[in-house]
Amino acid sequence: MNKIIIGLAIFANMAFLPVKAEPEVKGWKTLDSMGCMMLEECTDGVRQIKSWRDLGPEYGKFSQELDSIFASMDKLGIKFFLADDKYFIGLTRGLYSVDSNNFFANKKYTTKPSRMLQVIRHEGWHAVQDCMAGTLDNTYTAIVYPTSTIPDWIVRGANRTYMKSVAIFEAEAMAAMYSDTTTKDGLAVCASDTPMWEVYPPTPLTTKWLIREGFITK
């Protein structure tokens, strides 16, 4: 009987614990709301996705690719979140954080499995670029493939859509969107004990970076 009373008392105390309030956001679809989501401080309408099964049975046809991607992400400590449109600026479909290495997909633009898959591949490739810069424990990214290997129509699209400083990085990620192996294989290497640059020959610019940071020698 005493055990029951103690148990009820604990439950009663828990019932009256204050609920953690959501941070005050200055405005939706702003840098403030996006930052709040990326810092994992805003959680309303934000859900972590740990498997394609969390997205629904219609993703089963992509299970082999997604199982590999999620397994690599889990090993690397990368988290993937599906969030309401209110957090994203403009027409943003997805985001990758070089600080936390997590990425986020906008619910509004990912209702179709094919669109969601493209966002996962795109943002996942940014993690691969992060890894190519030496380690995920930094805030830098590096080009993996020579620009000449990316289709011209993708490069032109990236140049129209993104700032010049990031266009080439985005062009690579856009190219990865249309491949069922590029992001999967890149993340698998990143999650392995083999350095990225031993599998993907670094470009001259990336080589200079890796030498300067001490990851490889001349």
Question: What positions do the PLM features span?
Answer:
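Sec-dependent N-terminal signal peptides
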Residues: 4-15
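Sec/Tat signal peptide C-region and signal peptidase I cleavage site
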Residues: 17-20
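Auxiliary, metal-adjacent structural segments of Zn-dependent hydrolase domains
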Residues: 23, 28-99
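Soluble non-cytosolic domains of exported or imported proteins
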Residues: 56, 60-64, 110-119, 163-168
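Structured segments of extracytoplasmic/periplasmic soluble domains
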Residues: 72, 127-131, 176-183
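Active-site scaffold of zinc-dependent metalloenzymes
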Residues: 83-117, 130-131
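Catalytic Zn2+-binding segment of zinc metalloproteases
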Residues: 124-141
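Metalloprotease/metallohydrolase-associated module, dominated by Zn2+-dependent proteases
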Residues: 141-218
